[in-house]
Amino acid sequence: MMKKRLWSRWILALAVVWPCMAAAHDRVREKENFDFDWKFILNADDRANAGMQVSEAGWQDVQLPHDWSISQNFDPKLSGSNGHLPGGIGWYRKTFRVDKKDKGRRIAVLFDGIYSRSDVYVNGQHLGFRPYGFCYQEYDLTPYLNYGAENVLAVRVNNPLEHDSVARWYTGAGIYRHAWLVKTAEVHVASYGTYVTTPVVTAERAEVRVRTSVANEAERTKTLSVRQQITDGEGRTVVQSGKQALQVAAGQTADTEHTLEIPRPQLWDTEHPYLYTLHTSVYDGRKLVDTYETVFGVRTCEFTSDRGFLLNGKPLKLKGFCLHQDDASLGTALPLRSMERKLEICKEYGVNAIRCSHNQPSPEFLDLCDRMGFVVIDEAFDKWKSGYYAQYFDAWWQEDLKNMLVRDRNHPCVVLWSIGNELQEAWDGSDTGCRRAAMLQDFVHEFEPSRQVCLAAQNRHNEKFSGVTDVVGYNYLEARMLSDHKKFPERRFLVTEELPYYCGAEGNIRSYDTNNPWNIIAENDFIAGGFLWSGTDYIGEAGWPSHGWPAGLFDICMVEKPRAAFHRAMWNDEPMVRIAVRDNALDIDHGRDLWQWPNMAAIWNFPRAYEGLVIEVNTTTNCERVALFHNGNEMGVRRTADYPNHTITWCLPYRRGTLVAKGINGTDTVAVHEIRTAGDAVRLKATADRGKLMADGQDLSYVQVELLDKDGTLVQHADRRMKASIEGEGRLVGFISSDLRRKTPFTSHEDKTYFGRAMAIVQSTRKAGTIRLRFDVEGWDEPVWVELTSEALPKDYVSDIPSFR
């Protein structure tokens, strides 16, 4: 239901705005989803696979997005950076037809992302190679097509995962983002060919400057005209330009510029992310030959040396998560709902900023951030001349950086470009790193000057290096930032990676100070904000037997951990209190080094031998005081201000029963949290985040299961093996607990609960109907069923996501 509420007005706007243009849109520009009916084979590398006549016996039927690595078995000999999962060489083939009536149009294929080292062919003709797996790729198919007959699109993907070819985190493998067939006239707006800026913004007016790149693939020069129209969030016309003449030579692209004015603009911000739409029309004489839509927001953004980050002239402390792009059993092949769900959970938690670590995200991820009100650091690279990108840097960095800038420059959520992270060049005592950083920053400034540029510097970085970019990002160096601010008061500081619990001292990042780094960020106005490493657990960057990073505030199933209470308290005004119990015997995957946490859980179950032993209990709160009750007996009332990190420490002898914490402001109890001793598990509770899905073959429902005792208390101390299965018009993507030390593949349908929980991911098919999900618990006689429904798309359905139109 939340999805419908979030997007309904945008669907309505598409239906009612500019009807003449909507009708023409069907004739002049078409964007067809190309995700279905692909064939795939792994590790059968033969260049003949690119041809027309290939036996597809032994090839799998797959749909996009597709990540072949996520379903494979773990191997301790493989890199932990990739979650101990294999790569290899995969081939994809898709047979399709193009109608004879499309002859004379330009037909192109657009891939949002292929990881990695991809070669693309149509009808045996090689179209191109792209090594970097995070860029979009567009290829013109027109010269090679058979009209009214079969065509074959083939893609070879090579992800070898050798030492110098593997990223530091799980990237997945394959055509892991969407694909599109785009049909236009020979004269058309180039892909991502509009550039919208708002250089003047006041309460009375916003000046909107538009640069449009128009491509002419006809055989003669064209004299064209271009018109712009802006509509508001309700679909009403705000302003419209006249037609502006433009001459484009054959085989060339030319730009035209318009300046429009929005009276009394509604500004985009994190609380009210208001959006406008630019409609671009291209005419050849009186004939409309192309239309193009660009969603944008009116806002100003600036990082300053004294006030931090300013959004529309007002300071906004960035409460950020660093996020990679994987999601449990899906790997990196993420449908829209996967991203939407994660961002919904982040928003509720208090996050207002996302750092896309360490690559540009999918285009629809930024569409969601635009609409949900997140500010984003869009990051081009992890490393430059070291690591997996080193072999391609010299030949490809300009193309890859431009790819990000062109695609993402109109998103109001993007407030900062990042050109690199934890770079080897930062340690170089020479000026090589400084020159390289300046080279990349100059490229960004020339191509997209409306935003500032940063890089993320690590421990022991060269002082000169961090002074090159507009904004300097520090990873885990809050203490050094305080002294560097005194040395370099003109620098603009941002914590690009923030430890979740411990804090390093200046000159000793591993001092394990228990003053949470967020305290330094919050207390100093000049620091723009911080981005937690990491917001969530993720696959990769692991040591056997773990297959992922377990030190996030949310686990891989997006369940909030007890350790996340501090930032929830700091990032929200709503009163809250949370109980967490310290126990070093808990079976928790700690992670490593300074990213660890003390062993804590919201659990009150210990062996009988613990009776009477003193247990440490923590209550984290944003209230003035906390009263703690043990089995109904008050253990005291304590002031939050008397304890560090808004966390009050209590010590009390263990007795089975209940612990209740009450948060108090003034004389009022404003928040309550209770944990209790659980008995034996006697029933399974299954909760779907959405009971109705769209029958589009992509939509998802996340079904969480919990072991409960007879009183409904979560049983976290006695996990059980379970099996999930499915009937009807759905596909079981996987059944997974949040324990990253698993032995079965991420797409397995069997697992053991972890702290009483596990999760199934269900995907719709393209047929409406009922979906029945079954859970069988080891040792229990009766299964538990969950019923979902999948509804057909309306005949006139138009996607509400700009990247899907």
Where are these predicted regions, by residue range?
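Substrate-binding clefts and catalytic carboxylate motifs of secreted carbohydrate-active enzymes
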Residues: E30-A50, Q63-L64, W68-I70, G87, ...
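Accessory beta-strand-rich segments of carbohydrate-active enzymes
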Residues: F34, L42-N43, N82, G87-Y195, ...
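Short glycine/proline/serine/threonine-rich loop/turn segments at secondary-structure transition edges
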Residues: D102-R105, L145-E150, D164, T221, ...
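Beta-strand-rich binding/interaction modules
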Residues: V122, R205-L246, A254-T256, T280, ...
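Short, hydrophobic beta-strand segments
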Residues: L141-P143, E257-L267, I648-Y654, T747-R766
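Edge beta-strands of extracellular beta-sandwich domains
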Residues: A167, T291-F296, D668-G679, E782-A792
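Short flexible loop/turn segments that cap and initiate beta-strands
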Residues: K222-R227, T270-T277, V614-E616, N622-E624, ...
